[in-house]
Amino acid sequence: VRIGQAIGIEKYKKFLNDLDLINSIQFDIEEMGKPIPFNWGKCKLATTSYGHGITTTILQLTSAYSTIANGGFRINPTLIKKEKYVKGERILEENVSSNLVSILRKIVTTKEGTATLANVEGYEVAGKTGTAEKILEGGYSRKKINTFASVFPASNPKYSLVVMLDEPKTNSEYVYNYRDGSGIKYKGTPFNTAGWTSVEVVGQIIEKIG
């Protein structure tokens, strides 16, 4: 929140717009989903600074992570394969892009990270989890939407992969040593946060198509 306050509304709003997270984007086909408009203020600045209070689409989130990971150049998503892609305008300095990818990599590789189930050997996956309570009229539901946005390989990012699961369910005896055998077997109330659901799906996708 303090970082958001230090940046200020106008600069932060411009940054989110530059990443195409809160504005409609140009695409080959019309998107069904679009970000919900909102009014900026001190409270909105505070909540958006830690990931709450805004909506976006999976396509826009994927595009934003691609921009963050590719050295900071804006991505224009397309379904058409081209012989040569023209770089968009620079949104981030290269050193900022590199530092952000390093942080995202630690979320996958460190014990304290929330995305260790995506640590597929040889692919250097980096990314960030998101667990959101579904909105109800006048409040929030206990049901969740889980997201994991990833880029890989971290040393030279080439791919972005985002998985969103709507109201996921988790096996209560899920084996946490899924990757390297060093974890524990959990018994009890199932975890249904992104680290146990969307992250696992991303890891399995990368393993199968890699």
Per-range role (PLM):
Residues 1-180, 194:
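Beta-lactam-recognizing serine transpeptidase/beta-lactamase-like catalytic domain environment
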Residues 85-88, 180-210:
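Short, gly/Ser/Thr-rich active-site loops of penicillin-recognizing serine hydrolases
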